[in-house]
Amino acid sequence: MTLNLSVLTPNRIVWDSEVEEIVLSTNSGQIGILSNHAPIATAVDIGILRIRLNDQWLTMALMGGFARIGNNEITVLVNDAEKGSDIDPQEAQQTLEIAEANVKKAEGRRQKIEANLALRRARTRVEAINPIS
C-alpha cells in the first residue's frame, strides 16, 4: 500500500506523488511513516526528508514548517524545499563554508542566531546531496 505525499512551499509544489515510506525530521526527532499511520500533525525541523519510492531512497532538504498525516495522505508545508538531485554540490559546499565563517565572526546575539540558522540550512543542503545510508 502507498501513501500520497505532497511537499509544498509558499511558491511551488515540490513533490506530489505516491511513495512507499518517508522519514521526516520533526522538532522532536525523526519519524518514519508507512501506510495506515496514525493521524498526527507535527512541526517540521530544518532537516532531511527521506522518501522511499520503488525500493530507492530519495532525499529532500526541508527548511522548517509543519506536516499533517492521516488517511494515507501526507501534506508537508515548509518555508523552502529542494530535492537533493536538484542541488548543485559545488554551490552548496561554498555556501556551507561561508556559513561556517559567518558563525565564527558573528557578534551579538542576533547575528549569532542568524548565522547558526544559516549554517543549519547549509548543512542540510549538503546532507541532501550526500545522504548517509
From Swiss-Prot:
Subcellular locations according to the entry: Plastid, Chloroplast thylakoid membrane
Keywords: ATP synthesis, CF(1), Chloroplast, Hydrogen ion transport, Ion transport, Membrane, Plastid, Thylakoid, Transport
Keyword Thylakoid carried by entry: yes
Annotated Gene Ontology cellular component terms: chloroplast thylakoid membrane; proton-transporting ATP synthase complex
GO molecular function: ATP binding; proton-transporting ATP synthase activity, rotational mechanism
UniProt cross-references to InterPro entries, sorted A to Z: ATP_synth_F1_dsu/esu, ATP_synth_F1_dsu/esu_N, ATP_synth_F1_esu_C, ATPsynth_dsu/esu_N
Main location class: plastid
Bilayer topology term: Peripheral membrane protein
UniProt keyword Membrane present: yes
Gene3D superfamilies the UniProt entry points to: 6.10.140.480, F0F1 ATP synthase delta/epsilon subunit, N-terminal
Self-association and partners: F-type ATPases have 2 components, CF(1) - the catalytic core - and CF(0) - the membrane proton channel. CF(1) has five subunits: alpha(3), beta(3), gamma(1), delta(1), epsilon(1). CF(0) has three main subunits: a, b and c.
Function of the molecule: Produces ATP from ADP in the presence of a proton gradient across the membrane.
Family: Belongs to the ATPase epsilon chain family.
Name this protein carries in UniProt: ATP synthase epsilon chain, chloroplastic
Organism: Atropa belladonna
Gene: atpE
